[in-house]
Amino acid sequence: MAKNVNSKANGKKSGSVKRALKEKKQPEPEFSDSEDDEVDQEKLVEELDEDFDEVANMLGADVTDPEEKKQSKLERKRKRDEEATAEYTKPEVVDNEDDAQNDKFEDAGLSEPTMRAISDMGFKTMTKVQAKTIPPLLAGKDVLGAAKTGSGKTLAFLIPAIELLYSLKFKPRNGTGVIVVSPTRELALQIFGVARELMAHHTQTFGIVIGGANRRQEAEKLAKGVNLLIATPGRLLDHLQNTQGFVFKNLKALVIDEADRILEIGFEEEMKQIIKILPKEERQSMLFSATQTTKVEDLARISLRPGPLYINVVPETAASTADGLEQGYVVCDSDKRFLLLFSFLKKYSKKKIIVFLSSCNSVKYFGELLNYIDLPVLDLHGKQKQQKRTNTFFEFCNAKQGTLVCTDVAARGLDIPAVDWIIQFDPPDDPRDYIHRVGRTARGSNGKGKSLMFLTPSELGFLRYLKAANVPLNEYEFPTNKIVNIQSQLSKLIKSNYWLHQSAKDGYRSYLQAYASHHLKTVYQIDKLDLVKVAKSFGFDVPPKVNITIGASGKSIEKKHKKQKRA
């Protein structure tokens, strides 16, 4: 049953803040039926059908971003990529507005168990990406797919994968027939949940292996036979290299989801090793990516067979974001940002809202602050233990209303139901990040949602980049008399509460550090920031002394502090 988001930090405030801060030889494939096999399979299905909470309890640390490669190396690689990709024919599937709107699952020739599951899930009509992708995948073609976020591509690759296992009558002793690789643990869990629903009436087995989970338990289940396996790259490579009894020589399909994100977070070498280890003969491959970068092309070249079908249901002239999304921005000085956010969250307290910030420490501080002043929120960021991240994610998914304050850990691939508003309190690094953030709302073919981006006057140049990326925005204005001015109360609170003061200082420092690390240096110039005003948004009357090590030296920040104090 749907519930509202409630924070435990609403009780005794100061106390709550203190507590909060204080290879065995592999068997030959045998695709045969027997009654004993059916009994064993049913037993294994029960063992492998793990509950989300069980999986969550085994999760661990976060994945960090790697350093970028040197520009000269990238340029050489880009030229090599362009020459190599010329040998690939990629006939684009042209999308028509009148097409792919009335395609029904019942007309796709799917098996009875799959159709029962789809009916149980409440689906009747395919989305565009499903209508364009499922038929060629069922026909055995390799596919390189591009689609808007929230377009329904999880079903687009899971349905053909499950149909393949069903048609081959896979048994546990045949090992793993399909592997789905996902960039993050949360997304892997989400795909696992969809797979569990789709396979409710099938006898094939399924499972998940992700970083931070109990590796020994995973290995035991792999040895028993997991026909459909969802995995994160690092843990999958570990099992491929080290787990005896993991039968993968009968692999028939490989799915790489969110390929661009997998590469962005540093799994390029792992993916190359995985593809090198996995059998290539008779293997169908599917690669999905929201953006087509040179690295994605490189990965497609080594993972897909020559001549894959390229499916892009988003014409280049179309808007990059969902049709049902209303997008806007507001120009606001740094010292008024938090006051405007507070007023907005108060006004829309009955809505379901996601607020994006640029750093973990900022999320931690504003989460603590908002809960302390009786505006309950949930918070999600990469420094949290995986179990808390997973529990928070599912709590917000199940909530009918409430606010989630988070970093970009929630901005990619995750399907959070019925989000009304996306607030980009801290600006995104580039248009791609903007698109993935707003993609958490207006999901599905008829989804509706709204987004609001906060910009300071010096950041308005970012709008040019969004326009070039076909992102339509309107300027919103908020009357000054509608903004609740709690600046003096905020300042007194930060002065009097040691724990909030420390948290605010950490958040302020991390905000500057993240700002200095932006790629669009012509838009986000730390030297143009009014540090006094920025500090006010964190509750300080005077900017605290901080040392940032990315993009600017601590010395330059100190000088600017002194100059602005004299002013």
Curated annotation (Swiss-Prot):
Domain comment quoted from the record: The Q motif is unique to and characteristic of the DEAD box family of RNA helicases and controls ATP binding and hydrolysis.
Species this protein is from: Scheffersomyces stipitis (strain ATCC 58785 / CBS 6054 / NBRC 10063 / NRRL Y-11545) (Yeast)
GO biological process, one term: maturation of LSU-rRNA from tricistronic rRNA transcript (SSU-rRNA, 5.8S rRNA, LSU-rRNA)
Record InterPro entries: DDX18/Has1_DEADc, DEAD/DEAH_box_helicase_dom, Helicase_ATP-bd, Helicase_C-like, P-loop_NTPase, RNA-helicase_DEAD-box_CS, RNA_helicase_DEAD_Q_motif, SPB4-like_CTE
Motif (Q motif): 103-131
Family to which the UniProt record says this protein belongs: Belongs to the DEAD box helicase family. DDX18/HAS1 subfamily.
Assembly, per entry: Associates in the nucleolus with the 60S and pre-60S ribosomal subunits.
Keywords per UniProt: ATP-binding, Coiled coil, Helicase, Hydrolase, Nucleotide-binding, Nucleus, Ribosome biogenesis, RNA-binding, rRNA processing
Residues of the Helicase ATP-binding domain: 134-310
Major subcellular location class: nucleus
Annotated stretches, region: Disordered: 1-109
Function of the molecule: ATP-dependent RNA helicase involved in 40S ribosomal subunit biogenesis. Required for the processing and cleavage of 35S pre-rRNA at sites A0, A1, and A2, leading to mature 18S rRNA.
All copies of domain Helicase C-terminal, residue ranges: 324-484
Protein's name in the database: ATP-dependent RNA helicase HAS1
Residues bound to ATP: 147-154
Gene: HAS1
